[in-house]
Amino acid sequence: MARKTNTRKRRVRKNIETGIAHIRSTFNNTIVTITDVHGNTIAWSSAGALGFKGSRKSTPFAAQMAAEAAAKASMEHGMKTVEVNVKGPGAGREAAIRALQAAGLEITAIKDVTPIPHNGCRPPKRRRV
């Protein structure tokens, strides 16, 4: 059997000017995904992917770094303006939005898309520290 050579797919530079920045901010981490208007992922980053471990992942600074990394990667594909969808109760919500703006992306709209149950599943029990 012939050995298959490991060929990596070259990253094609797309020219997408508008997109959507999805910020998922939980109590443990912040994930920033930048997609085109159809929902195809262009760039993503998270606090954990940048090397933050444990409780440092949940800080606003980690969210800021994740948003900057995702913004830089998306701007390489020609991204200029984004709509922001924020989901979750975490500490990094505002920090991530500010970082996207500081990185040079123009924010056209900010939406809170946190799912709210109509009395669905029972929530986890209260923490006793």
Swiss-Prot record:
Which controlled-vocabulary keywords does the entry list?
A: Ribonucleoprotein, Ribosomal protein, RNA-binding, rRNA-binding
Gene3D superfamilies on file: Ribosomal protein S11 (3.30.420.80)
Q: Which domain of life is it from?
A: Bacteria
Annotated Pfam families:
Ribosomal_S11
UniProt-listed GO biological process terms: translation
Q: Which residues form a coiled coil?
A: none
List the InterPro entries hit by this protein, alphabetically.
Ribosomal_uS11, Ribosomal_uS11_bac-type, Ribosomal_uS11_CS, Ribosomal_uS11_sf
The protein's GO terms of the molecular function aspect are:
rRNA binding; structural constituent of ribosome
Pull one GO CC term from this UniProt entry: ribosome
Tell me the subunit arrangement.
Part of the 30S ribosomal subunit. Interacts with proteins S7 and S18. Binds to IF-3.
Family the entry assigns: Belongs to the universal ribosomal protein uS11 family.
- Protein role: Located on the platform of the 30S subunit, it bridges several disparate RNA helices of the 16S rRNA. Forms part of the Shine-Dalgarno cleft in the 70S ribosome.
> What name has this protein been given in UniProt?
Small ribosomal subunit protein uS11
Q: What gene is behind this protein? A: rpsK
